[in-house]
């Protein structure tokens, strides 16, 4: 089955992918990442949260994980960066912030999703993106969704 995972480039999503991907080894998996949630400027408390959830992982931790032997996992390493996870999925891991625009939607269509798992994805899917996968979209989100 072709499974497309839509997720955010943050700590919780990286952890979720580390748990999901091994269980999906029998499937064709493509992962698209959003760079952030929402498009409005962040209030100061949310900027601090962004540092903990995104900047710390992507700017400090992941480069250290990826620096050894071309990013290959170290012996005994249990959690992997987005870049290391990309080596474990056939469809790759890439950024897709504009899934509802023509070019972004075309990239999404190319993943030929039978099922979409949306885990903390930072973009609200419009009807064409929602109706594309024949088995639907399963949305896993850690908080209330906007109206």
Label every model-predicted segment.
Residues 1-147:
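One-carbon transfer enzymes
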């Amino acid at each position: 089955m072709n499974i497309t995972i839509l997720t955010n480039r943050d700590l919780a999503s990286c952890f979720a992918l580390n748990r999901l991907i091994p269980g999906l080894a029998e499937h064709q998996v493509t992962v698209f990442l959003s760079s952030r949630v929402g498009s409005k400027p962040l209030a100061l408390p949310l900027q601090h949260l962004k540092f903990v959830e995104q900047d710390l992982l992507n700017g400090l931790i992941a480069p250290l994980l990826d620096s050894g032997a071309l990013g290959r996992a170290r012996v005994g390493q249990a959690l992997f960066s987005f870049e290391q996870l990309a080596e474990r999925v056939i469809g790759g891991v890439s950024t897709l912030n504009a899934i509802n625009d023509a070019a972004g939607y075309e990239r999404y269509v190319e993943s030929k999703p039978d099922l979409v798992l949306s885990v903390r994805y930072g973009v609200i899917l419009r009807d064409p993106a929602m109706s594309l996968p024949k088995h639907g979209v399963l949305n896993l989100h850690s908080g209330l969704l906007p109206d």
